């Protein structure tokens, strides 16, 4: 099994197969999820003090904050999948 890693900014990397959702932090339900994760000790702040622009929800229940746009994280996620798909196909 290949491990796919996604760069979420500032040298921080998450495992692609653990990601459930990549969302914007603007809505009230997402803000509530962030608050609950902070209280449970399951919040990982990878923003380096910058504004949170993407919230990544992992299958372990961890919530990861990133300073890059959700679209950018999603594109990196898709690129990591495409690279794997093209490298595994016989030519």
Curated annotation (Swiss-Prot):
Disulfide bridge map: none
Protein family membership: Belongs to the RemA family.
Species: Cyanothece sp. (strain PCC 7425 / ATCC 29141)
Pfam families: RemA-like
Name of protein: Putative regulatory protein Cyan7425_4125
Domain of life: Bacteria
């Amino acid at each position: 099994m290949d491990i796919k890693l996604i760069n979420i900014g500032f040298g921080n990397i998450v495992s692609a197969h653990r990601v459930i959702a990549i969302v914007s932090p603007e809505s009230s339900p997402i803000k509530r999820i962030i608050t609950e994760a902070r209280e449970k000790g399951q919040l990982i702040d990878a923003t380096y003090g910058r504004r949170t622009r993407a919230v990544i929800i992992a299958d372990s229940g961890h919530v990861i904050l990133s300073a890059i746009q959700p679209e950018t994280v999603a594109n990196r996620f898709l690129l990591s999948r495409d690279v794997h798909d093209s490298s595994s196909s016989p030519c």
